Amino acid sequence: MRGEVVHIHLGQAGTQLGNSAWELYLLEHGLTQDGRKDPDSTVAGEGGSYDTFFTESSNGKYVPRSLFVDLDPSPIDEIRTGPYRQLFHPELLISGKEDAANNYARGHYTVGKEMAENVLDRIRKITDNCHSLQGFLVFHSFGGGTGSGFGALVLERLAQDYAKKCKLEFSVYPAPRVATAVVEPYNAVLATHSTLEHSDVTFLVDNEAVYDICRRNLDIPRPSYEHLNRLIAQVVSSITSSLRFDGALNVDLNEFQTNLVPFPRVHYPLISYAPVISATKSAHESFKTSELTLQCFEPNNQMVVCDPRNGKYMAVALLYRGDVVPRDTSAAVAALKAKSSFNLVEWCPTGFKIGINHQKPMSVPTASPADGGLASVDRSVSMLSNTTAIAEAWSRLDHKFDLMYSKRAFVHWYVGEGMEEGEFSEAREDLASLEKDYEEVAGDYNDVDVDAEY
């Protein structure tokens, strides 16, 4: 028994990401769209441990341990009428009557607060059915109203009720040039401020970076959210694969935290995935372990727009899947460390955590190869790296926040929902000190008296 993981999907981004993630899980476990074992599946018998993600019902159906919540009814209605309507427990699809209107304060204080108790009750129901709960994966965006405001509210409550359990976030972060709402910088700064203390590890994804990966590597001229989400789902799946399948080096949720977060506030790793290649091109490529590992460190394979060559790595987790042996991974890491462009901080000499899982990576089949589906490959690697370069992303966000806040633009919408204006400046100060934390970590720690602690 490896422990269960509960998925919580909040807001439109969380819901759509969740849809792609569960689509992939069903494929990996050999289950049909309504959660029964698929007789035609190639993974029959090797479906791994179902218990981690699914509860088995009395009639042999596997029901996901997941909760979908949105204050706006339409994204949840899409699931209720979509291809997976038979899969999810209807009580665990919760939608409100009015949406958060891209307003953090609505999601956190007014509309969201009314739904909070109901949502926490449902979470309690799911966790009561678990033998040994490992933790939570929370999917949401920092830019929307529900994702930021309600997401922060749910994480605050989880931190109270499940203090010892692991809480990992997958957050869609506002992209540098593409914005879906004018007030994204406000929502993101407020949400980051209120979740900093409550989340153990937050994996950031920005849509622009993933768009570029899809355009460049999969030759999709205009990628849709579905293309983006399927790519992100591959990383989500790798993170939990060793809880579900056997491998040479297993990694559980707590290990991410232990190995990736040197200081509690600095918990925003970058993620990247290789190989991202279309089915039409895959015949011309070799996917050696060492090549895939190097691909992960290319700036244009990373899911947040920032340049890791400008920063230093504090810790890196490499999660391999498929036909990979430990000797190859050690050689790949040694080759990496020898490169001059790879900078580790001085105070963390090893810096690498490796996971190996024997389950081959799978991808959701598309109607035609031209649709930009991922090629089926024998091995893949997901990289989670805590690097000081991600401070670039924070400073971009803070700059946008400052431009609007200097004129107090749009602030009345937040104050009108019962939020105090002081919370804006408090949140902004918190992010300024987060940027400072990254600067200090990147600097040498030689001036700190390390012996004083012992």
UniProtKB/Swiss-Prot annotation:
Keyword terms of this UniProt record: Cytoplasm, Cytoskeleton, GTP-binding, Hydrolase, Magnesium, Metal-binding, Microtubule, Nucleotide-binding
Cofactor(s) listed in the protein's UniProt record: Mg(2+)
Record-marked site positions (Involved in polymerization): 453
Xref: InterPro entries: Alpha_tubulin (IPR002452), Tub_FtsZ_C (IPR008280), Tubulin (IPR000217), Tubulin/FtsZ-like_C (IPR037103), Tubulin/FtsZ_2-layer-sand-dom (IPR018316), Tubulin/FtsZ_GTPase_sf (IPR036525), Tubulin_C (IPR023123), Tubulin_CS (IPR017975)
Protein EC: 3.6.5.-
GO BP annotations listed: microtubule cytoskeleton organization; mitotic cell cycle; nuclear division; nuclear migration by microtubule mediated pushing forces
CDD domains linked: alpha_tubulin
Binding site for Mg(2+): 72
Pfam families: Tubulin, Tubulin_C
Keyword Metal-binding belongs to the record: yes
Catalytic activity from the UniProt record: GTP + H2O = GDP + phosphate + H(+)
Subcellular location field: Cytoplasm, Cytoskeleton
Record-annotated active site: 255
Positions with a binding annotation for GTP: 12, 72, 141, 145-146, 180, 207, 229
Gene Ontology CC terms: cytoplasm; microtubule; nucleus; spindle
Family: Belongs to the tubulin family.
Assembly information from the UniProt record: Dimer of alpha and beta chains. A typical microtubule is a hollow water-filled tube with an outer diameter of 25 nm and an inner diameter of 15 nM. Alpha-beta heterodimers associate head-to-tail to form protofilaments running lengthwise along the microtubule wall with the beta-tubulin subunit facing the microtubule plus end conferring a structural polarity. Microtubules usually have 13 protofilaments but different protofilament numbers can be found in some organisms and specialized cells.
Protein name: Tubulin alpha-A chain
Organism: Neurospora crassa (strain ATCC 24698 / 74-OR23-1A / CBS 708.71 / DSM 1257 / FGSC 987)
Name of the gene: tba-1
